[in-house]
Amino acid sequence: MEVLPRILLFDSGVGGLSIYHKIKKSLPKANYHYYADHMASPYGDKDDEWLDHRINRILIQLDQALTPDIIVLACNTASTLSLESLRSNITTDIVGVVPAIKTASEKYQAETIGLLATPATIEREYIENLTNKYSSNKTIIKVGSTELVALAEEKLHGGEIPDTSLHRIITPFIDANCKHVVLGCTHFPLLKPELQALAPNIHWIDSGEAIANRVQHRLGLSANSGSDKMKPQPETTGSNFYSSAEITDKLQTYIKGIGFTKVKSHYLPCI
């Protein structure tokens, strides 16, 4: 019998759904489990030591409970902070998500590139090393925002997104005539239609497709296949969404509409 892969995605909230959409397009038959740590969201303003401990404890428990074939750390802040420690604590293959600075620098000849991310990601040494390695000859305009994370969450919870707030956040890119901006938080592609409407001359770059390709490659699968090499998982087929806090009815409706059969709030592994 064909055994389909189980893919676990982890984020502080709904941002990782931007990655989920890309992976599901590549692997539509896979079983997906998504964990949103809404209780501690946003991650971008939390203490590093506290956050690293929390991420490791939750994912160790989820790995044991769900036995995924691969874990996608669908959060830039978590990836730049905890990817190394997670790989030392968990044997399951883990794919991280980092801002597409390398892609933007190599693909576009612009002298100026923007980076829109959370303050924690902006300030991370990992990002400094990334920009020094691939963009040393370019001007990098960095804008850190946790407000944009909240706006993306609000959108999927059914709220209105004020153009004035978005415009204020992206004004540094507009003023600098920046044509290419890397979206360095998985929440931000959820607002790409609004960003494009406000700044149509800016190319907003995210890493969703690259991550989907990497996951497919790591699993060794074609788009519509399973594999007899996957872990047997007869008891929990289907796709499930978990949140560490309460989520609105509108968000639950949205989540079920994109392929998740079960939604569970207040699910917090022992940490």
Which residues does each predicted region cover?
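Non-catalytic structural scaffold of enzyme domains
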Residues: 1-271
